[in-house]
Design a protein with these regions (language model features):
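Active-site surface patch of divalent metal-dependent phosphodiester/phosphate bond hydrolases
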Residues: 1-95
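Metal-dependent phosphoesterases centered on the DNase I-like endonuclease/exonuclease/phosphatase
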Residues: 7-12, 20, 137-196
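Extracellular/periplasmic catalytic domains that process cell-envelope and extracellular macromolecules
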Residues: 12-16, 53-57, 108-111, 120-124, ...
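Structural recognition of the beta-strand scaffold that forms the well-ordered cores
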Residues: 20-23, 60-64, 72, 116, ...
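Solvent-exposed, acidic/flexible segments
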Residues: 52-56, 107-110, 143-154
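Beta-strand-turn-beta hairpins that frame and shape the catalytic cleft
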Residues: 65-70, 87, 109-133
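Acidic/histidine-rich helix-loop elements
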Residues: 90, 97-103, 139-149
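A Trp-anchored, charged/polar loop motif used as the substrate-binding/catalytic surface
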Residues: 96-120, 158-178
């Protein structure tokens, strides 16, 4: 598709050539060995760390005309939902936690991945391309587990860009904190934002 559309001149305009790519690992389809959707089984697509029938389904890619600084790029694939202060973890109708203690201790916030892709515009100027694809806030029941996860996946970026709120954040390499106050950034992706 890339070569049939993006890199082909269209409507009298020159073709766009993306020399740099970033393809992160994603949580969709990665088996958790837990019954995360409470259907009595542990091997369905709803039991993966992110809904998916196979690892990598619904993955994402960043295409860039500018160099990607892979050394400074960060991923948050394994950040645990419980580690977000005030996390909106779902509850049953009787106010008991929806997820068991074991499930909560292993449940990742990101249904795909959250990535801070550092793109170098000039030798002295770069910006942070903050990409994610939160779970749709539907396909659940009264516990609203997907709606709550979607909320916190979007909230993650709000905290990440706010130095006073990002101290709890850790990336997949164990580095803590978010952006500094003077960082340039763009938030992008299919956020599936719930208007309610």
């Amino acid at each position: 598709m890339l070569f049939r559309s993006l890199e082909v001149p269209q409507n009298g305009r020159k073709a766009i050539h993306y020399e740099h790519t970033f393809i992160p690992q994603v949580n969709t389809g990665i088996p958790s060995s837990l019954d995360l959707d409470n259907d009595g089984k542990t091997n369905g697509p709803g039991d993966a760390f992110g809904y998916g029938k196979f690892p990598g389904q619904y993955g994402l890619v960043v295409l860039s005309k500018y160099r990607i600084d892979s050394r400074r790029t960060r991923t948050f694939q394994k950040f645990l939902w419980k580690d977000m202060p005030g996390a909106l973890l779902p509850r049953q109708a009787d106010n008991q936690p929806y997820y068991s203690p074991e499930e909560t201790s292993r449940f990742r916030l990101s249904s795909k991945n959250h990535c801070d892709v550092v793109i170098r515009l000039t030798p002295t100027t770069d910006f942070h391309f903050l990409v994610s694809h939160p779970t749709p806030p539907v396909f659940d029941r009264e516990e609203d587990r997907n709606g709550r996860r979607n909320h916190d996946e979007i909230r993650f970026w709000n905290d990440y860009i706010s130095p006073s709120r990002s101290k709890y954040v850790y990336d997949d390499q164990g580095v803590r904190g978010g952006l500094t106050g003077d960082s340039l950034f763009v938030i992008a992706g299919d956020l599936n934002a719930d208007p309610h």
